Design a protein with these regions (language model features):
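Short glycine/serine/threonine-rich phosphate/pyrophosphate-binding segments
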Residues: 6, 24-26, 114-125, 146-147, ...
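Active-site/ligand-binding loops adjacent to catalytic centers
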Residues: 54-83, 105, 130-133, 138-229, ...
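Glycine/aspartate-rich loop-and-adjacent alpha/beta segment that forms the canonical ThDP
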Residues: 83-90, 249, 257-279
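Glycine-rich beta-alpha junction loops
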Residues: 22, 47, 74-77, 115-119, ...
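Buried hydrophobic positions in well-ordered alpha/beta secondary-structure cores of metabolic enzymes
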Residues: 33, 95, 111-112, 118, ...
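Single conserved hydrophobic/aromatic residue that forms the stacking wall/gate
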Residues: 1-12
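Phosphate/pyrophosphate-binding loops at sites that engage ATP/ADP/AMP, CoA/4′-phosphopantetheine
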Residues: 97-106
Length: 279
């Protein structure tokens, strides 16, 4: 990614739209993008998060025919959700390859991935969608609780609607407007969901677990203590499914760790779970 980014910089100007709040929450990632030559433009409207960044990026794209629109999430108008899902499918391709080497079988019993807009889960699930023996579990962000009013559990409490050019599931207020999402995780606080995941959930092919901030934080410290791996806060939502679900001792469960947690250290160290870990 980095070498491609540098190469493109010789030909194209790169402008990255990012929610102003998310810039604060993901400062290390922002600094990396700047070092690679990108101009990071804060989205200052609305909740100042992913939803608003997509709004402003789409607006900039439509205003100038010389602009080329890229998005890393499986949301927006066709063909973007399908393109992103296919590009991300290298994840499930790699899962199959590694499982074959380690277990002699390509398919696990379960694949678990966190779910915001949907790129990570789309990639982890892609080559297993037509494998009915493989259970697909998406961990979406419940924030402070599904019924708290501060949540991003779109598939749990959302309804059908149109957002960013696609018909999908989204959270709405009493007037039918898009409702502001909340999650401690910057990558999961999106009020909608990719259309692929809306379809998988509606048809029953994908199961959904709503994971709170605290459950994700607890899972992050568990993995850090047990394996010495500090996961991204987004990935920690998927890890939390281990305690929320009952798995058999012989089940092969693949949990996709979508990123590292250095960007989330402030949230980790300020949480109540850090007290025991630091003593």
């Amino acid at each position: 990614d980095r070498s491609v980014s540098r190469g493109l910089g010789d030909v194209y100007k790169r402008q990255v739209y990012m929610g102003e709040l998310d810039i604060q929450r993901q400062r290390p990632n922002v600094e990396r993008m700047k070092m690679l030559g990108a101009k990071v433009i804060p989205a200052t409207s609305g909740s100042k998060t992913l939803n608003d960044a997509v709004n402003e990026a789409l607006e900039a794209w439509m205003k100038d025919p010389e602009n080329f629109y890229l998005i890393g999430s499986a949301v927006g108008p066709q063909p973007y959700p399908e393109m992103v899902s296919r590009f991300q499918s290298v994840i499930s391709e790699e899962i199959k390859k590694q499982l074959k080497e380690k277990t002699g079988k390509e398919n696990p019993d379960y694949v678990v991935a966190c779910l915001g807009g949907g790129s990570n889960a789309a990639g982890a699930f892609y080559h297993f969608i037509n494998e009915p023996s493989v259970h697909l579990i998406a961990a979406e962000a419940a924030g402070k609780g599904v019924d708290s009013g501060e949540t991003a559990a779109t598939l749990t409490i959302g309804e059908k609607g149109i957002l960013h050019g696609s018909q999908t599931m989204l959270m709405k207020d009493e007037q039918g407007n898009v409702k502001e999402a909340y999650s401690l995780s910057a990558g999961l606080d999106y009020p909608g969901i990719g259309p692929l995941h809306a379809h998988l959930a509606k048809t029953g092919r994908m199961e959904v677990e709503a994971v709170t901030d605290d459950e994700a934080l607890k899972a992050a410290f568990m993995l850090t203590r047990e394996e010495g791996i500090i996961p991204a806060l987004e990935s920690s939502h998927a890890l939390a499914v281990l305690e929320k679900r009952k798995f058999g001792k012989d089940d092969v469960v693949v949990i996709n760790i979508s990123g590292r947690g250095d960007k989330d250290l402030d949230n980790y160290l300020s949480s109540s779970f850090a007290q025991g870990a630091l003593e």
